[in-house]
Amino acid sequence: SEKYLQSRDVKYVYFNYELDGVQCKDDFGRTNAPADLYKKMLAGAECRTSQVSIGEYMAFWRPFLEEGKDVLHVSLSSGVSGTYESACQAKVEIEQEFPDRKIEVIDSLQASSGYGLLVDGLADKRDEGLSFDEAVTWAKEARHRVYGWFFSTDLTFFVRGGRISKTAGLLGGMLNICPVMDVEADGSLAVKEKARGKKKAIARVVEVMSQTAEQGNAYARKVFISNSECASDAQAVKELIKEKLPQIDDINIFTIGATIGVHTGPGTVATFWWGEEPRA
């Protein structure tokens, strides 16, 4: 969330999306509150995301570079967006203007609050006094240990986006099937399993977490949960995590923004944690 990023002193650039041909900023719901956005989508509004442009990246970084600062930029996963490529091209261009400054672009290989969890960890390292180069090395290794598993109770937009076939979507709706998905090692999204009902989907996500988390059931680091207009489901995930992994006391629930939400629609809950091993 915007408040969380500000509390960690993390600077950010807005993503873009189109709603019925109108260009909008993904500005934490100020332009379109999530509930309104999903209502419009369900009513048939045309929605699509567009990546941050090279010019937008350069305009975002330039003030910091002019102040004599170096820039370490973490991008949304290249597995779900072309924005990493834009950032890399912007880096090449702006380096010509600021040859004495360091500019590094890192592919988070994550989305939503998984992307956020990596940036949060990086902010911790910055506050611990890591040098620029040490922070880059840390982030490139750490990104492989952020796990993200999620499920959805509404398959409409997964079908629309081609992630699930129409037949599977129809059957899934009739049989109350929730696809359980993850963020793969290459940063793309994949359907891993299918659960009958959200209770089983929630249980499976928490089970995977206990199997893969740093120190297993003794995991005591942060957990980030994102949801698209299904706060009670996110709360149910949080409660089960607290029951199964009692050492955790820092579980944050966030709202899925438009950049991811236009692909998932309402009814999606995503859970992110630090893993013991890199994602396979």
Task: Give the residues covered by each predicted segment.
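Glycine-rich phosphate- or other oxyanion-binding loops that anchor nucleotides, phosphorylated ligands
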Residues: L42-S78, E85, Q89, V136
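A short glycine/small-residue-enriched secondary-structure motif
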Residues: T31-Y38, W61, L65-E66, E93
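N-terminal glycine-rich anion-binding loop in soluble enzyme alpha/beta folds
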Residues: S1-E56
